[in-house]
Design a protein with these regions (language model features):
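Conserved beta-strand-loop surface patch within small alpha/beta domains used
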Residues: 1-134, 143-219
């Protein structure tokens, strides 16, 4: 019997704003970066380049704790990366401020959202507290290192095909984490930075965006 799955039937596109990335003094590398990825991070900061991905410590902690919780059973986890897309000196980058997830159906090598939990997921996204954009997704590879499988790559191509979309993969057993984006027929790793809390600046919160969800039978 086909299992109903949700589809976003209405969305609002916003122009990409010119915004400076988080200050360099607020940036730090993830503790689980490989030597190669750490070298790319250091080189980018030394040159003053704009990274393609900045992630709040709050969002990183949620992802890491979720992955670590299921690591003893070697179960994969997943969720959405919520944030904003900006441009600075001609470079488009994404800022992840929070994550969204719900009940999952997972094993040591596969994971997907529980279809019955989609309504709660979208309600939680609406209550996120800021005018978010889906800037990518994350999932774990417990004990399998960090890469995009054929299934992961297909997911990226069909659902996250914009230049700013990121696939974040975390291995809680090997203490590894990497960020990827599409490149040609495949994908490439991109350096990313974590940033700490912002000082209060008096800006008003953005309006919440409501997503209309309609059940659609999967083929």
């Amino acid at each position: 019997m086909p299992v109903p799955s949700p589809r976003i039937v209405k969305e609002t596109k916003r122009p990409i704003e010119e915004r400076e990335p988080p200050e360099r003094k607020r940036l730090r590398p993830h503790d689980w970066l490989s030597e190669e990825t750490r070298a790319a991070f250091d080189a980018a900061l030394e040159s003053g380049d704009v990274l393609r991905l900045y992630m709040s410590e709050k969002a990183e902690e949620k992802i890491r704790l979720q992955a670590v919780k299921e690591a003893p059973r070697r179960l994969e986890v997943m969720g959405f990366l919520l944030g904003e897309v900006s441009s600075w000196h001609g470079v488009t980058y994404a800022t992840v401020r929070d994550v969204g997830t719900t009940s999952l159906r997972s094993s040591s090598s596969k994971v997907r959202f529980d279809p019955e939990a989609f309504p709660k997921l979208f309600l939680d996204l609406d209550d996120s507290g800021f005018d978010y954009i889906l800037v990518g997704w994350y999932h774990s590879h417990p004990g399998h290192t960090c890469f995009l499988s054929k299934t992961d790559l297909e997911t990226q191509r069909t659902m996250f095909d914009q230049p700013y979309h990121t696939a974040l993969v975390i291995d809680p057993l090997n203490h590894d984490i990497r960020a990827f984006r599409l490149a040609g027929d495949g994908y490439e790793e991109i350096p990313f930075a974590l940033f700490g809390p912002e000082a209060p600046d008096g800006r008003k919160k953005g309006r919440k965006r409501r997503l209309k969800v309609t059940p659609v039978a999967s083929k």
